[in-house]
């Protein structure tokens, strides 16, 4: 059994991208040859379809595939009666089928290959099946002594066979590109600074509770905090900020977002968090709250959400709320929230009516647009 060659190192294979792992597939092909000499060829019977077979042969003593060559000296049928037909026959096979390519040639008086013909692909052989050439060589050309193909009236045929065996996969890792860059943990690490109150330089007071924070991070994330610390304001001088109109739990969630960009409890307090995000100019958090509120729009809360969106200039949420009210107009107008809005925010009622009147066709369903996050 021939040894499967090892794949070339990845760096030698190409100058293109280098994969972290690779697989090299070797399709094993067993090649062997066979020579068959027919003495006194001119005495072969000249009936069309007459068959001469060689003895059986194989690639080696342990190969259970047995082959033979088959010649029709005067062709196989009427179409090929002026030709010699030559075929490779699979005599015995332990498998259901094999695939093989073959090449036939004639050896002249000098032992040189001439008149070679070969298969263009690997053919499927089953036991008893043959493949070859019905018109391998013209009889008149073969029998013409001037061509030197029958020295001493001997026809010598040379056959090369390539049998396709099983494929072998070799896989491995590219040792040239094994550097693994760890995932960025910046959000977790900054979150740790907030949770553990390490290296803080300012105090935030919320409803009597004090929270230690970092001015640089607050200023980088919020234009409002940045203005407090940048100018000669009381907060900057005392490193102490009074946070008003924000509940402690909402404040904690806002601070978590400032440090990590995440707000795991957003769905539970989206309305209050929207107000805090608006107050401290946290635009991405604001849109995240809009998206959460939009997904929870209902007939009962549509009017309240519209008021909230208008109060905090949440334009995307406001558009979604108006569209929802238009689609469910008859039901929404029966709710206490709508009736209260008629009294407290008549301009929003007017906006909703204008939108409803300008609609060119009824909505096919409640809006489900995904909000854009800045």
Curated annotation (Swiss-Prot):
PROSITE patterns: BTB, MATH. Belongs to the Tdpoz family. Component of a cullin-RING-based BCR (BTB-CUL3-RBX1) E3 ubiquitin-protein ligase complex that mediates the ubiquitination of target proteins, leading most often to their proteasomal degradation. GO terms for molecular function: ubiquitin protein ligase binding. The keyword Coiled coil does not apply. Residues 31-161 form the MATH domain. This is Speckle-type POZ protein A. The BTB (POZ) domain mediates dimerization and interaction with CUL3. It comes from the Eukaryota. Keywords: Nucleus, Ubl conjugation pathway. Pfam families: BACK_BPM_SPOP, BTB, MATH_2. It is found in: Nucleus; Nucleus speckle. Residues 173-297 form the BTB domain. Pathway: Protein modification; protein ubiquitination. GO terms for biological process: proteasome-mediated ubiquitin-dependent protein catabolic process; protein ubiquitination; regulation of proteolysis. The keyword Nucleus applies. GO terms for cellular component: Cul3-RING ubiquitin ligase complex; cytoplasm; nuclear speck; nucleus. Residues 71-191 are annotated as: Required for nuclear localization. Residues 297-355 are annotated as: Homodimerization.
